[in-house]
Amino acid sequence: MEDLLKRVLKCEALQQPQWSEPSQLHDAQAYLRDSASLIRVEDILVLRATLARVAAGEAMIIQCGDCAEDMDESAADHVTRKAALLDMLAGTFRLVTQQPVVRVGRIAGQFAKPRSNHSERIGDVELPVYRGDMVNGRDAVLGHRQHDAQRLVRGYRAAQDIMQHLGWKEPSGQEQLTGSPAWTSHEMLVLDYELPQVRRDEQGRTFLGSTHWPWIGERTRQLTGAHVALLSEVLNPVACKVGPDITQDQLLSLCERLDPRREPGRLTLIARMGAHKVADRLPPLVEAVRRAGHKIIWLSDPMHGNTIVAPCGNKTRMVQTITDEITAFKHAVVSAGGVAGGLHLETTPDDVSECASDAAGLGQVGSHYKSLCDPRLNPWQAITAVMAWKACPPPSFVSL
């Protein structure tokens, strides 16, 4: 285990907090190392088998939840509402696709966010930017915005509560498509939280104990970076966001690092191209990965490439643009011989107005805006996004 940690720590790690009290970081990491794993190896194996079915075209995935989770929303009522929305969207997706649907939440650990800037100006004051509840506070006060390592422990405890409320108490023993707890996932970002939760079972298998299904984002997918190094070592299925600027060579090198044995369902690529770029940029990438022999699941993130600023000054996204990208995504993937496996959405069960239906609705954005970071789809908007899959053309599979 020490050798693994050394290999990861010698790599460059981007988007990491600058903790204000190093002694508190030491204590927090010790707590995380001594705490129980949030997930079990047997569940990882079940999830990998389930995702292999998706990679074979036998099931679909709906992955959704908050952009940034609120650690104060770890009580049963909050978790129940989020799980109910996931169930509703999965049911809708099942009707649309006529296939079983794997339910995955952006939940029980989505407490940190990468940011473009280190600071922001609020009025006349320059403050550290908010990086998620696991790192610092939201209030526009310097004391709240300092990076506080004690929040790592709060994040673990909140995730533990959420896991229990989701129903992860008893061994699974079967492939979980319906009638069982939703799988958990989050962006594997803060290594001071993730590394102490790396575990090794009796058979010597290394796994990440913080979540069932970790992913890395556009800002941390560097081939020689610490995040890729860690994902390459763990038993968990893994995922990576893919934007319009990645080259075929970069993507193939990334796939080789994360999926060297070409195992179906081991690696999922989450395309976040933007509605106006996906048709041109995605097909060559899908074809290159297919020809390299990787049994990849492709998911569409139709939100992050389509963020704009509303008249009120808040970030927003238009549902029309989101559905346009979903339609273009599926056509791009299936025409290139890939497996279009489902959707990755930022959603909330609350009746918010963070996303607009179209350009005419931009003036309504902000009247009910509660997101801690990026705009989310409310339930009706999320259903519209899921239904957009039905408008896509049927697959035309291409053999290797």
Swiss-Prot record:
Entry EC no(s): 2.5.1.54
Enzymatic reactions: D-erythrose 4-phosphate + phosphoenolpyruvate + H2O = 7-phospho-2-dehydro-3-deoxy-D-arabino-heptonate + phosphate
Name of the protein: Probable phospho-2-dehydro-3-deoxyheptonate aldolase
GO terms, molecular function: 3-deoxy-7-phosphoheptulonate synthase activity
Keywords: Antibiotic biosynthesis, Transferase, Virulence
Enzyme class label: transferase
Highest taxon of source: Bacteria
Pathway assignment: Antibiotic biosynthesis; phenazine biosynthesis
Gene3D superfamilies according to UniProt: Aldolase class I
Family assignment from sequence similarity: Belongs to the class-II DAHP synthase family.
Any matching Pfam family: DAHP_synth_2
One Gene Ontology biological process: aromatic amino acid family biosynthetic process
InterPro entries in alphabetical order: Aldolase_TIM, DAHP_synth_2
